[in-house]
Amino acid sequence: VENLLVAQHQQLKPGLFSGLLKAPAFRRAQSEALDRAATWLERIGLLEHANRQASNLAYGDQRRLEIARCMVTQPEILMLDEPAAGLNPKETKELDELIAELRNHHNTTILLIEHDMKLVMGISDRIYVVNQGTPLANGTPEEIRNNPDVNRVYLGEA
């Protein structure tokens, strides 16, 4: 739970004396933060590990926990840089489902930087392809899949 509470401290702002005296506003804010943390731990499938340190979780679980840590702050946009790096196929599929849920059910825009094209094509509405720092193409997954420049650069001449 502490893993998710740490992300919410900036939003709570109960004040020093309010916290020391355990004022009603402090208790209410603390309760809401705990509820949000528990909700997100359940959503990512880690509620049974609520009191474990992040470093003691499996690598895929650590990745999901990082995303939940962001989501407790209720962001409008979430930037994920190579979230599938180092994950096995099962963990990548779970990540794909989690990202789709965030986008579809939590009104969160996802900015995804990723090399796993199966993941990118499966969850993206729009894709921007960059080749060695230069923009190459942008469009829907279907447009990118059929783009001759993308195919030439990434698949080679057929």
Predicted segments with their positions:
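Glycine-rich phosphate-binding loops of nucleotide-dependent enzymes
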Residues: 1-158
